[in-house]
Protein backbone atom coordinates (compact mmCIF):
# COMPACT_ATOMS: atom_id res chain seq x y z
CA UNK A 1 0.00 0.00 0.00
CA UNK A 2 1.38 3.39 -0.95
CA UNK A 3 2.14 5.75 1.92
CA UNK A 4 0.07 8.67 0.65
CA UNK A 5 -1.41 10.00 3.88
CA UNK A 6 -0.14 10.32 7.46
CA UNK A 7 -3.61 9.53 8.82
CA UNK A 8 -4.37 5.79 8.81
CA UNK A 9 -6.88 5.19 11.65
CA UNK A 10 -10.26 4.46 10.00
CA UNK A 11 -12.26 6.94 12.09
CA UNK A 12 -9.65 9.63 11.59
CA UNK A 13 -9.61 9.01 7.84
CA UNK A 14 -13.40 9.31 7.77
CA UNK A 15 -13.46 12.61 9.65
CA UNK A 16 -10.20 14.29 8.67
CA UNK A 17 -10.20 13.32 5.01
CA UNK A 18 -13.68 12.41 3.77
CA UNK A 19 -15.93 14.63 5.91
CA UNK A 20 -13.46 17.50 5.73
CA UNK A 21 -13.27 17.15 1.94
CA UNK A 22 -17.05 17.13 1.58
CA UNK A 23 -17.35 20.24 3.75
CA UNK A 24 -16.68 22.24 0.57
CA UNK A 25 -19.49 20.62 -1.42
CA UNK A 26 -22.24 23.11 -2.21
CA UNK A 27 -24.59 22.69 -5.18
CA UNK A 28 -24.45 26.44 -5.86
CA UNK A 29 -20.84 25.98 -6.95
CA UNK A 30 -20.47 22.26 -7.80
CA UNK A 31 -23.12 22.08 -10.51
CA UNK A 32 -23.73 19.07 -12.77
CA UNK A 33 -21.02 18.85 -15.42
CA UNK A 34 -18.72 21.40 -13.77
CA UNK A 35 -15.06 21.13 -14.75
CA UNK A 36 -13.08 20.84 -11.51
CA UNK A 37 -9.30 20.94 -11.05
CA UNK A 38 -8.14 19.35 -7.78
CA UNK A 39 -4.82 21.17 -7.39
CA UNK A 40 -2.22 19.31 -5.32
CA UNK A 41 -4.62 16.40 -4.95
CA UNK A 42 -2.18 14.17 -3.02
CA UNK A 43 -4.09 11.02 -2.04
CA UNK A 44 -7.20 12.37 -3.77
CA UNK A 45 -8.69 14.86 -1.32
CA UNK A 46 -11.07 16.55 -1.86
CA UNK A 47 -11.35 15.14 -5.40
CA UNK A 48 -12.30 11.52 -4.62
CA UNK A 49 -15.03 12.35 -2.05
CA UNK A 50 -16.42 14.95 -4.47
CA UNK A 51 -16.48 12.36 -7.28
CA UNK A 52 -18.39 9.97 -5.01
CA UNK A 53 -20.79 12.72 -3.93
CA UNK A 54 -21.53 13.93 -7.47
CA UNK A 55 -20.35 11.60 -10.23
CA UNK A 56 -21.26 14.08 -12.99
CA UNK A 57 -18.50 16.46 -11.95
CA UNK A 58 -15.58 16.38 -14.42
CA UNK A 59 -12.59 16.26 -12.10
CA UNK A 60 -8.96 16.60 -13.15
CA UNK A 61 -6.61 15.29 -10.45
CA UNK A 62 -3.44 17.40 -10.52
CA UNK A 63 -0.24 16.53 -8.68
CA UNK A 64 3.52 16.84 -9.05
CA UNK A 65 4.08 13.17 -8.11
CA UNK A 66 3.23 10.55 -10.72
CA UNK A 67 2.87 7.73 -8.16
CA UNK A 68 -0.08 9.54 -6.57
CA UNK A 69 -1.82 9.86 -9.92
CA UNK A 70 -1.18 6.18 -10.71
CA UNK A 71 -2.87 5.30 -7.41
CA UNK A 72 -5.80 7.62 -8.17
CA UNK A 73 -6.31 6.06 -11.60
CA UNK A 74 -6.81 2.73 -9.84
CA UNK A 75 -9.19 4.30 -7.30
CA UNK A 76 -11.34 6.03 -9.92
CA UNK A 77 -11.47 2.85 -12.02
CA UNK A 78 -12.60 0.87 -8.97
CA UNK A 79 -15.27 3.51 -8.29
CA UNK A 80 -16.39 3.39 -11.96
CA UNK A 81 -15.98 7.16 -12.03
CA UNK A 82 -15.91 7.94 -15.74
CA UNK A 83 -15.02 11.65 -15.81
CA UNK A 84 -11.55 11.54 -14.24
CA UNK A 85 -8.58 13.15 -15.91
CA UNK A 86 -5.04 13.26 -14.58
CA UNK A 87 -2.46 16.01 -14.85
CA UNK A 88 1.16 15.54 -13.79
CA UNK A 89 3.25 18.68 -13.38
CA UNK A 90 3.83 21.87 -11.44
CA UNK A 91 1.05 24.38 -10.80
CA UNK A 92 3.32 27.25 -11.84
CA UNK A 93 4.04 25.71 -15.25
CA UNK A 94 0.85 24.02 -16.45
CA UNK A 95 -1.15 27.26 -15.96
CA UNK A 96 0.74 28.78 -18.89
CA UNK A 97 -0.59 26.15 -21.32
CA UNK A 98 -3.66 27.27 -23.28
CA UNK A 99 -5.47 23.97 -22.68
CA UNK A 100 -5.54 24.58 -18.91
CA UNK A 101 -5.46 28.35 -18.54
CA UNK A 102 -8.81 29.75 -17.36
CA UNK A 103 -10.35 26.42 -18.38
CA UNK A 104 -12.02 25.27 -15.14
CA UNK A 105 -15.28 26.20 -13.42
CA UNK A 106 -13.80 25.32 -10.03
CA UNK A 107 -10.30 24.80 -8.64
CA UNK A 108 -10.05 23.11 -5.24
CA UNK A 109 -7.14 23.03 -2.79
CA UNK A 110 -6.74 21.44 0.61
CA UNK A 111 -3.66 21.61 2.87
CA UNK A 112 -1.34 22.71 0.05
CA UNK A 113 0.12 26.13 1.00
CA UNK A 114 -0.81 29.47 2.53
CA UNK A 115 -3.54 31.41 0.76
CA UNK A 116 -1.47 34.15 -0.94
CA UNK A 117 0.56 31.42 -2.66
CA UNK A 118 -2.54 29.41 -3.55
CA UNK A 119 -4.24 32.44 -5.07
CA UNK A 120 -1.31 32.87 -7.47
CA UNK A 121 -1.23 29.16 -8.31
CA UNK A 122 -4.97 28.51 -8.57
CA UNK A 123 -6.72 31.55 -10.04
CA UNK A 124 -5.00 31.38 -13.46
CA UNK A 125 -6.78 28.02 -13.99
CA UNK A 126 -10.24 29.39 -13.11
CA UNK A 127 -12.62 30.75 -15.77
CA UNK A 128 -13.86 34.28 -15.21
CA UNK A 129 -17.07 33.81 -13.23
CA UNK A 130 -15.80 30.52 -11.78
CA UNK A 131 -14.53 29.78 -8.27
CA UNK A 132 -11.38 28.89 -6.41
CA UNK A 133 -12.53 26.80 -3.41
CA UNK A 134 -9.93 26.65 -0.62
CA UNK A 135 -10.27 24.44 2.46
CA UNK A 136 -8.34 26.22 5.19
CA UNK A 137 -7.46 25.68 8.84
CA UNK A 138 -7.64 27.88 11.94
CA UNK A 139 -5.66 30.80 10.49
CA UNK A 140 -8.09 31.36 7.61
CA UNK A 141 -9.02 34.96 8.59
CA UNK A 142 -5.35 35.92 8.85
CA UNK A 143 -4.63 34.26 5.49
CA UNK A 144 -7.47 36.16 3.80
CA UNK A 145 -5.97 39.41 5.12
CA UNK A 146 -2.53 38.36 3.79
CA UNK A 147 -4.05 37.63 0.37
CA UNK A 148 -5.61 41.01 -0.41
CA UNK A 149 -2.86 42.06 -2.81
CA UNK A 150 -2.67 38.67 -4.54
CA UNK A 151 -6.46 38.63 -4.99
CA UNK A 152 -6.44 42.12 -6.48
CA UNK A 153 -3.65 41.24 -8.94
CA UNK A 154 -4.98 37.80 -9.94
CA UNK A 155 -8.62 38.90 -10.29
CA UNK A 156 -10.22 37.17 -7.32
CA UNK A 157 -12.77 38.20 -4.69
CA UNK A 158 -13.62 36.32 -1.49
CA UNK A 159 -17.37 35.86 -1.93
CA UNK A 160 -18.25 33.35 0.82
CA UNK A 161 -16.42 32.31 4.00
CA UNK A 162 -18.09 29.22 5.46
CA UNK A 163 -16.80 28.28 8.95
CA UNK A 164 -16.86 24.49 9.49
CA UNK A 165 -16.71 22.15 12.46
CA UNK A 166 -15.84 18.48 12.07
CA UNK A 167 -17.31 15.79 14.37
CA UNK A 168 -15.15 15.25 17.45
CA UNK A 169 -12.64 17.96 16.56
CA UNK A 170 -12.29 21.30 18.29
CA UNK A 171 -10.07 23.01 15.73
CA UNK A 172 -11.43 25.88 13.65
CA UNK A 173 -11.56 25.65 9.88
CA UNK A 174 -13.39 27.21 6.96
CA UNK A 175 -14.13 26.83 3.29
CA UNK A 176 -13.40 29.93 1.19
CA UNK A 177 -15.28 30.46 -2.08
CA UNK A 178 -13.23 32.93 -4.11
CA UNK A 179 -14.88 34.22 -7.28
CA UNK A 180 -12.79 34.96 -10.37
CA UNK A 181 -13.99 38.41 -11.43
CA UNK A 182 -11.44 39.23 -14.14
CA UNK A 183 -8.71 37.53 -16.16
CA UNK A 184 -5.38 36.83 -14.46
CA UNK A 185 -2.39 38.66 -15.99
CA UNK A 186 -0.44 36.34 -18.29
CA UNK A 187 2.80 36.59 -16.31
CA UNK A 188 1.21 34.73 -13.37
CA UNK A 189 1.90 32.30 -11.87
CA UNK A 190 5.57 33.16 -11.65
CA UNK A 191 8.35 30.58 -12.03
CA UNK A 192 8.48 27.56 -9.67
CA UNK A 193 9.06 28.41 -5.98
CA UNK A 194 8.95 32.20 -6.50
CA UNK A 195 5.44 32.54 -5.02
CA UNK A 196 6.50 30.62 -1.91
CA UNK A 197 9.68 32.65 -1.38
CA UNK A 198 8.14 36.00 -2.31
CA UNK A 199 4.32 35.99 -2.00
CA UNK A 200 2.41 38.82 -3.66
Give each language-model segment a name.
Residues 1-37, 67-84:
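Class I SAM-dependent transferase core
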Residues 56-62:
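Short beta-strand element of Class I
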Residues 68-70, 140, 144:
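Short alpha-helix immediately C-terminal to the canonical SAM-binding loop
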Residues 129-142:
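Conserved beta-strand signature within the Rossmann-like core of class I S-adenosyl-L-methionine
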Residues 43-56:
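Conserved SAM-binding loop of SAM-dependent methyltransferases across substrates and taxa
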Residues 54, 126-128:
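Helix-to-beta-strand junctions that scaffold the AdoMet/dcAdoMet cofactor pocket
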Residues 62, 69-102:
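S-adenosyl-L-methionine
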Residues 145-200:
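SAM/dcSAM-binding transferase cores
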Amino acid sequence: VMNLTAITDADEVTVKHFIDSLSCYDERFFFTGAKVLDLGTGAGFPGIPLAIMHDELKITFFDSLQKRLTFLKEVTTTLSYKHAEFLHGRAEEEAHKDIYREAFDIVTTRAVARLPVLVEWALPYVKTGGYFVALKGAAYAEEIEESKNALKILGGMVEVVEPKKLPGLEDKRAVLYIKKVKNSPVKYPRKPKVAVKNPL
